[in-house]
Amino acid sequence: MDEDNLETALQTYRAQLQQVELALGAGLDASEQADLRQLQGDLKELIELTEASLLSVRKSKLLSTVDQESPAQEDAEYLAFQKAIAEEVEAPGAPCNDSETAPGSEVQPGSTSSALEEEEEDPDLEELSGAKVNAPYYSAWGTLEYHNAMVVGAEEAEDGSACVRVLYLYPTHKSLKPCPFFLEGKCRFKENCRFSHGQVVSVDELRPFQDPDLSLLQTGSACLAKHQDGLWHPARITDVDNGYYTVKFDSLLLKEAVVEGDSILPPLRTEATESSDSDTGDASDSSYARVVEPSTVDTGTCSSAFAGWEVHTRGIGSKLLVKMGYEFGKGLGRHAEGRVEPIHAVVLPRGKSLDQCAEILQKKTKRGQAGSNRPPKCRRSGSRPEGRPPPRNVFDFLNEKLQSQVPGTPDAGVDTPERRNKDMYHASKSAKQALSLQLFQTEEKIERTQRDIRGIQEALTRNTGRHNMTTAHLQEKLEGAQRQLGQLRAQEADLQRKQRKADTHRKMTEF
């Protein structure tokens, strides 16, 4: 319906609504009022829909009017833009001291031709916007891969070369996934966004778009499959049924899925087993990463210990390194500036902290240095096991006997209080734990004895003046319990004194 018909219908509906409202105010019976109220609601809803339709028609007319006026403005702006670019191109060709040319001076033919070329290239770059191409991508480990992408718009590099911004169609990780808010112009994170805002690549590096060839996919072949998160993960086809592919992802965190043909494509890098000559001669495989065969690799300065542990495994580590472009004998990294020798594994003691492990390694290092600086004779004498005592001779025996016969010197086998105190002062961790255990047991015995004493005292209170024999027996039992309590308290005080002495030594020696 056009605008006039909608306005006429809207006036008719409003007039009918006024008549219904007048009828409701006339005081009809309940059944008629219910019908009129329902009719009133329907008319209001119809009026709202008609007003919305009328508003959309008016908007479309305004937009068409603006579209008819805008081409003239766009043509003028485009001509001004081309003129500004031509001036920028002419500026580098002029001498530094003659930035302003005199009137009537001739323009060099080279600058004119370059300006014309620039004017011819700009429309081409604008035409590339929205086109599908095969664009390069450098992975995190420096491997060059070509992904199918779409051109978003033209960009200008720092050196002035022609570049375009592309968005990859088959993102394999989150940094390649296009940001949905960037496409709408609403992303607030800009360069700090986790998703891709496009990558600027040179126009010279672009290649023609390659349609995925699904005819190569069959049961058991490797592929890239689209997951629910929007990323394309490496997988392997387990079944094909009427255009539906059952895939099992390489990652154990992803479940098996059934996808259609638009959610699967061949892998970006094939598992080629051909020689390097055939790889360079085949132009169809130019979009894949270069695979270096182990048979043609020079070992260089790397030692033979590199990847030596793979004699016990399937060698998947070195195969992955080769697929990522690593060449044996060279350093790691994109420019081969990394380390060459492998990192040796060090087995650390179980249940020890990192500080304790570092201390053990330092002791081993110092012991090895001391052993290397020691003379050969001393090294042989130091090779005796630590548990074996040193050899004894006659003089050691005589010295022990003479020292034991000196008056005032305690015997080596007698455990005197002074020796006990000294040993406790230098007590080890296990001795301190045993001391704490003894103190805990003594406190439990004291509590048990105190409960027994209270029970005996209650029994004495009950039997006072009744049974003399029972009272005497309870009195004797009470005295024995009190003596035992005194001994336990003395033992507790002695253990507490030893514990304080050990704590004092620990506080004075630990910083």
Curated annotation (Swiss-Prot):
Domain G-patch: from-to ranges: 313-359
ZnF segments: C3H1-type: 174-200
Bias kind Basic and acidic residues: ranges: 491-511
Region (Disordered): 92-129, 266-291, 363-393, 490-511
Alphabetical UniProt keywords: Acetylation, DNA-binding, Metal-binding, Nucleus, Phosphoprotein, Repressor, Transcription, Transcription regulation, Zinc, Zinc-finger
PROSITE patterns: G_PATCH, ZF_C3H1
GO cellular component annotations of the record: nucleoplasm; nucleus; plasma membrane
GO biological process: negative regulation of DNA-templated transcription; negative regulation of epidermal growth factor-activated receptor activity
SMART domains to which the protein is assigned, alphabetical: G_patch, ZnF_C3H1
Gene3D superfamilies (UniProt xref): 2.30.30.1190, 2.30.30.140
Places the protein is found: Nucleus
Phosphoserine modified-residue sites: 70, 276, 353
Biased composition (Acidic residues): 116-127
The keyword Acetylation belongs to this UniProt entry's keyword annotation: yes
Family annotation (InterPro entries): G_patch_dom, Znf-CCCH_4, Znf_CCCH, Znf_CCCH_sf
Annotated PANTHER family: ZINC FINGER CCCH-TYPE WITH G PATCH DOMAIN-CONTAINING PROTEIN (PTHR46297:SF1)
Function recorded in the entry: Transcription repressor that specifically binds the 5'-GGAG[GA]A[GA]A-3' consensus sequence. Represses transcription by recruiting the chromatin multiprotein complex NuRD to target promoters. Negatively regulates expression of EGFR, a gene involved in cell proliferation, survival and migration. Its ability to repress genes of the EGFR pathway suggest it may act as a tumor suppressor.
Protein name: Zinc finger CCCH-type with G patch domain-containing protein
Native species: Mus musculus
Lineage: Eukaryota, Metazoa, Chordata, Craniata, Vertebrata
Gene that this polypeptide is encoded by: Zgpat
